Amino acid sequence: MLIVLYLPLEKTMKLLIQNLIIASLSTSAMSEYVGLSFEYEEAGDDLWTMRLYADFTESTDQLTGVFADSQSSLYIRSENGFYQNPFGGPTSLSINPALFDVFPSLEYDSWVTIGSEDQIDNAMLVAGIDWSEFENGGDIEIDNGAWFATTDDIQTIAGNDLRVLIGQFTTYGWDSQIYGSINLVGQYGDLEPFAARDQYFGWVPGPSTIIVLGLAGIHTRRRRS
């Protein structure tokens, strides 16, 4: 079941993001968020699927949210459009793994998440986002909203892989680039919050490789004492 929170005048959403970001702006230092990474695979019928991750240096680091606000918008785009399965949804909250045997192509649905690849034990929330264009195969474009979980939710933790899943995106054709710019908030294992704005990614796949086109942005955190 998809859970969407509609917040009055968007004030609650702004406070949620601002509180996390302001707490991380006192000084900057070497961050334990190290950037974005990906996995990809062929999905059949001239489709290819990319999984996007936020990478960390400590297993206890956490990614708690992906957001957009007045300072930094968010977009995730594909040149040939995104594959959307009718039995899926815009987030991993809609992915029921019990249906994979009956509808194998559901495994390649396009969705966003915080750490969880399906609805099992998934505590993610969504605020202020209209998914209609994305669900029709179009882009994700957000100027004020977020998908997120709390620091109490295990799905936010980097774990032994030192990464947290952000989304799965399937597109049409090997010539179709998936690219975007996202903003992240989270918390390090020492309980210090961080914010990473304008994290750009863009990859063009090939039969045996993907070309990394770019990765840029800024992130801030409190200095360790």
Predicted features along the sequence, with ranges:
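A short, hydrophobic C-terminal helix/tail in secreted or cell-surface proteins
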Residues: 205-221
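Positively charged n-region of N-terminal signal peptides that target proteins for export
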Residues: 10-16, 221-225
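Sec-dependent N-terminal signal peptides
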Residues: 16-25, 211-216
